[in-house]
């Protein structure tokens, strides 16, 4: 149908369609000029939830997001006469989405999230009309979507030892909350990570590695205070167990340096005087200190 014939159809519409409801014209009018968008939109969850006909015009169909369509119709189109998300500032896009999604998304958390603060709008990640991932209406598969901005993380997931995101065994959102988390930072690194709650422990890691949760009678302070990332990379590493160093003892000696049997001023145990670190027998610390994340039996994590 060409543009002239489309507009000819509007001449046949009842005047009441434009006169009532403060400029709301109904989604069937939108369908006349936007048949391609309509053909995909009516199949997705948004359409199902807002096109039931049980809600008032401002919460029904296309106009629940794009606003009253009368001026847009009378002007024969144009982004200046309708709520057009492609030109809307990110904070305004968020306001529109939160009209419905405020129950599932915390207004405070999402407004202070690093995505929002860096100008990432809802439609930067979500494809509202048509989506390759219908469950969350994502514009792409989740990992590909995240890699679009976080290319450095894509490289880490290609390392020999990594969390298996590319293989489909887990997703970015298993650890990260893209809409903002209760904890503004991932405590162990002190950098914004938008992860789920981290109250007293490293919750993103412990969701899977629950055996490391504790509490233990004898805590390894670096685990409890500074966190998992002090020893492990979170995404990928050239070292087994995602360790930050290729040899275990070099990692341990970053804290347990000095000689003699005792403690440093900060309370950290020094390297044992009986351990000759040039001897390969002493270079794999965890061969003896097997409960390195914490123990209920031994202060030196020997069992």
Label each PLM-derived region with a short phrase.
Residues 2-10:
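Sec-dependent signal peptide recognition
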Residues 3, 18-303:
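Short sequence/structural segments immediately N-terminal
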Residues 11-19:
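Hydrophobic h-region of N-terminal signal peptides that target proteins for export
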């Amino acid at each position: 149908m060409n543009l002239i014939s489309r507009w000819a159809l509007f001449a046949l519409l009842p005047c009441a369609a434009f006169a009532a409801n403060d400029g709301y014209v109904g989604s069937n009018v939108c369908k006349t000029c936007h048949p391609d968008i309509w053909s995909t939109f009516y199949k997705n969850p948004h359409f199902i939830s807002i096109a039931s006909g049980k809600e008032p015009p401002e919460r029904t169909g296309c106009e629940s997001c794009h606003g009253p369509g009368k001026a847009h119709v009378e002007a024969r189109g144009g982004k200046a006469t309708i709520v057009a998300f492609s030109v809307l500032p990110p904070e305004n896009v968020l306001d529109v989405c939160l009209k419905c999604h405020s129950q599932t998304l915390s207004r405070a958390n999402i407004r202070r999230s690093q995505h929002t603060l860096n100008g990432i709008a809802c439609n930067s990640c979500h494809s509202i009309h048509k989506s390759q991932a219908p469950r969350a209406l994502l514009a792409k598969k989740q990992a590909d979507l995240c890699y679009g901005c976080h290319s450095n993380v894509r490289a880490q997931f290609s390392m020999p030892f990594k969390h298996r995101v590319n293989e489909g065994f887990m997703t970015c959102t298993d650890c990260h909350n893209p809409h903002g988390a209760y904890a503004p930072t991932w405590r162990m690194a002190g950098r914004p990570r938008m992860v789920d709650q981290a109250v007293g422990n490293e919750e993103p890691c412990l969701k899977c590695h629950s055996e490391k949760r504790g509490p233990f009678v004898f805590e390894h302070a670096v685990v409890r205070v500074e966190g998992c990332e002090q020893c492990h990379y979170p995404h990928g590493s050239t070292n087994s167990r995602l360790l930050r160093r290729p040899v275990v003892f070099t990692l341990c000696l970053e804290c347990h340096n000095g000689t003699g049997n005792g403690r440093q001023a900060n309370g950290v145990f020094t390297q044992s005087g009986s351990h000759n670190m040039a001897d390969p027998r002493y270079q794999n610390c965890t061969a003896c200190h097997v409960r390195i994340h914490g123990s209920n039996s031994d202060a030196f994590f020997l069992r």
